[in-house]
Amino acid sequence: EIYETILKEMQSAGSSGEFYTPRALTEFMAEIVNPQIGEKMADFACGTGGFITSWLGELDKKVKTAEDRKEYNQSVFGIEKKQFPYMLCVTNLLLHGIDTPLVYHDNSLTKDVLNYTDGDKFDVVLMNPPYGGNEKSDVKSHFPSDMRSSETADLFMVLIMYRLKKNGRAAVIVPDGFLFGADNTKIAIKTKLLRDFNLHTIIRLPGSIFAPYTSIATCGGCSRRLFYKGNVVLSFGYARGLQAFLQDKIYEVGTLRPNP
C-alpha cells in the first residue's frame, strides 16, 4: 500500500516529459503483444516498471512448470535514467517475485545504435518514451546522421528499431508530433519504420487517458498514439465519435469499430 501511494504521488510529468503510464494502459499493451514463455521483453525508459510488471502479469498466466518459472524470472530488462524511479522499479520487481531484476540506472541513448548485435536485441519492446525533451549533440551522435533528431521520443523510436529482433513485436506510445512531423529527420525515421517493419495498428488515445496529468505545459493537450509493430499488414483504426474515455475503459478500444 505504501508503494502504491508513492506511485500515485509521482503521477506527473517532469522537465523531460516523462509519464508514469496508467496501469490500465500498460496492461492493455501487454495483453496485445501476447507474451510467450522464453521471450525477452525490454523497456528502455522503464520508469517505475509499469510495463515490466504488466508483461509479467500476462506471462504468469502461461507458467506451467518450474522451467517456465525460471524463464519468467529472466524475461524482463529495463533501463531508467533517473535514480528515484529506478529504485522504485527495482522495488516493484522485488515485490513481484523477481529476485535479481535486470534493471539498470543508465541512459539508453548514449550508445551507438549501429554497434548493437543480435545478442542485444529483444523479442518484445513495451514503452512510453519520454517526450518533449531535447537531446544535445553528444547524444544525437550515437544515431545515424539522417535520424539525429533533437526530440527524445524520436530517438527512442530509432533505438527500438535497432534493438528489436527479427519477427519481434513492439507496442509504443508516441506523441502526435511523431506521426505528423514533416521535417527531414522525422521523415527518415518513419521511412525506416515503414520500410523495415510491418506497422500493424495505430490506436488513437485521447488525452483523457492520462487525466488529470495532461494539463501540464509539456503535454499541451496533444493526443497520443499507440504503435504496434509485428509481421502483419498495415491496418488503421480508432474509436471514432469518442471524445474521451476513462482509464478503466481502455480495454474496450480493442473491440470498437469505426462508424460507417
Question: What name fits each language-model region?
Answer:
Residues 117-260:
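A conserved structural/catalytic subdomain of Rossmann-like adenosyl-cofactor enzymes
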Residues 1-10:
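Long recognition/docking surfaces used for binding and targeting
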Residues 1, 61, 164-165:
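Short, flexible segments with low predicted structural confidence
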Residues 18-127, 132-134, 150, 154, ...:
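Conserved S-adenosyl-L-methionine
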